[in-house]
Structure formats: C-alpha cells, structure tokens
C-alpha cells in the first residue's frame, strides 16, 4: 500500500508525537520512500511548525510558556532528544574508550 504525501505526513506527525524523535532512515524504511522524500516531508512539517528538524531526523516541538521556552533544555530532555543516534554513537565510542578516559557527558552516560 502506498501513501500519498498527506497521509504520510500525518503518520509522521503521529510517530513524532508518540516517540518524541524520528530518524529519516527509519521513516524511509517504514514508508518505503526515499530519504529525499522523507527530508522534504520533514522540511514541510517544520515550516508548518509541527516538528523541529535536526541532522538525520526530527523531534517533537517542546510546548510551554514563553518563560520556559527561553530556559536551557534540561539533562533529561537532552538525553531523550535524538536518543537513537546517541545510542549508536555510544555503541561505537565504547569500543574506543578505556578506564580513566571518560567524563560525565550525556553521550557517555548512555554507555552505562
């Protein structure tokens, strides 16, 4: 079954709302669409104010009042944002890190 762009974009919105973040590569597989098509969909959805894009994917826009929007995003929110790419980075990095070479960043924390 193929979806038109309207249906695909609505499903992308649903996935972003459920998961918090989505990756272009994963969406291309789910919808049997090219990565270029998915990137165009995400660009369109960002222009409509539905998602915010990051390299390789998109995330749910954090809602809140103007006071919280100006505050820095906390550790928990940063940790959850783009967690799949961070996990892949952590898996690759853990092979290169030896005892005494780490610091307390959120990417390193995912290795634990």
Curated annotation (Swiss-Prot):
Residues 22-41 bind DNA. The gene is gatR. Gene3D superfamilies: Winged helix-like DNA-binding domain superfamily/Winged helix DNA-binding domain (1.10.10.10). InterPro entries: Carb_Metab_HTH_regulators, DeoR_HTH, Tscrpt_reg_HTH_DeoR_CS, WH-like_DNA-bd_sf, WH_DNA-bd_sf. It comes from Escherichia coli (strain K12). This is Putative galactitol utilization operon repressor. SUPFAM superfamilies: Winged helix' DNA-binding domain. It holds the Pfam family HTH_DeoR. It comes from the Bacteria. The keyword Repressor applies. One of its GO terms (molecular function) is DNA binding. Residues 5-60 form the HTH deoR-type domain. SMART domains: HTH_DEOR.
């Amino acid at each position: 079954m193929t979806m038109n762009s309207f249906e695909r974009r609505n499903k992308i919105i649903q996935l972003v709302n459920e998961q918090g973040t989505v990756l272009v590569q994963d969406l291309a597989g789910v919808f049997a669409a090219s990565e270029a098509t998915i990137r165009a969909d995400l660009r369109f959805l960002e222009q409509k104010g539905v998602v915010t894009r990051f390299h390789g994917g998109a995330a749910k826009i954090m809602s809140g009042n103007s006071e919280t929007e100006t505050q820095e995003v906390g550790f928990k929110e940063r940790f959850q944002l783009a967690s799949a790419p961070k996990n892949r980075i952590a898996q690759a990095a853990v092979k290169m890190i030896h005892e005494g070479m780490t610091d307390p960043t959120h990417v390193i924390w995912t290795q634990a």
